[in-house]
Amino acid sequence: MDENKQKALAAALGQIEKQFGKGSIMRLGDNRAMDVETISTGSLSLDIALGAGGLPMGRIVEIFGPESSGKTTLTLELIAAAQREGKTCAFIDAEHALDPVYAKKLGVNIDQLLVSQPDTGEQALEICDALARSGAVDVIVVDSVAALTPKAEIEGEMGDSHMGLQARMLSQAMRKLTGNLKQSNCMCIFINQIRMKIGVMFGNPETTTGGNALKFYASVRLDIRRTGAIKEGDEVVGNETRIKVVKNKIAAPFKEANTQIMYGQGFNREGELIDLGVKCKLIEKSGAWYSYNGDKIGQGKANACKYLKENVDVAKVLDTKLREMLLSPANINDESAELVEEMPEQEEF
C-alpha cells in the first residue's frame, strides 16, 4: 500500500478507536479469538456435527422441530453443561410449561437457574435484552417463539386479525439483541415450532413461526426430528432422534447427528461413546463383545453402556480422546461428520 495511504489509514483507525473504544475495528487476522467459544450440547455426535464442539457464545441459535421431538430437552442438556462450567443461565418460559422435576433429572441446578414466565411477547424480549445487556448471564433460552404473543393480540378480541404483528416484533428484537449478545458474549437460544404452508404443491411445505428475521440473524439453526422409538420389551423408554444442522456460520452446515433421547435421562451419551469409539477404532467389537484397551467392557451394547455409566472416569477419557480425534483443527474435515452421519441405528435395549 502507498505510504500516504498507510498513514491516512493509521490515523483513521486511531480516530475510530479513540471515539468508539479499543477493538471497535481490527484486521481479521489480528484477533486470535476467531476461535469461537462454545458450550457442549450434551451430545457428542451433535458437537461433532456442529464442527466446533458445541453451540457458539455471543450468537443467536434457533432450534425447531415437531412436537415432542426433544427441543426443550436439548436446551436443558446445554444449560446443565453450561452450569457445570460455572456459567449463569436463564430460561424465559413463554409456554408456561417448564417442568423443574424433569430439568433436575437432566442435571440442571434448578436453584441457580433464572426463570421468567412473561405475560406478553414484548415483555419476554425486553427481559431477554436486559439480561443480555447485564453482561452477567451466559445462556438465555426462549421457549418458544410461537408463544411470544404480541400485547395487542392479547388485549384484542378472539377473532381480531393481527397480520404480521409477531414478525415485526421479532424483527425489531433481533436488531437490538444481536449487538448486545456479541458484546456480552451471551448465547441466546430460541426454540421454535413448525407450521404448514397452505397450497404448497412442490418443495417442503413446512415453515417456522415468527417470520424470516430469526432465520437471518441465527448463527446456527438445528432441525430436530424423532425417527423411531426405543423399547424395553413392549415399553417405550426413549426416542431415536436425528438432528440436522440446517444453518451454520461457524463451520460447514448440513451435517447430521443420530442420537437417542431416553425418557427422564436425556441423551444416551454412553451409546454415542460406544458407536463413535467403534468407528474410530478406540473400542473393539468382536461378535457381541465390546473391549476397550484390551479389557472386555460388556457383552451387548446395553452392558457396555452400563459399564461406562458405572466407570465415569473411563467414559471421560474416551470422550476426551474422541473429541481430540474428531474436533482438533488439524482433523476437522468431512470425515468426522461422515462418522456421525454413518453411525448405525442404535440397538434396542
UniProtKB/Swiss-Prot annotation:
Positions contributing to ATP binding: 65-72
Gene3D superfamilies, sorted: P-loop containing nucleotide triphosphate hydrolases (3.40.50.300)
Molecular function, one GO term: single-stranded DNA binding
Pfam family, one: RecA_C
Gene Ontology biological process terms, A to Z: DNA recombination; DNA repair; SOS response
Keyword Nucleotide-binding: yes
An annotated GO cellular component: cytosol
Similarity-based family: Belongs to the RecA family.
Protein name according to UniProt: Protein RecA
Organism from which the protein derives: Vibrio vulnificus (strain YJ016)
Gene that this polypeptide is encoded by: recA
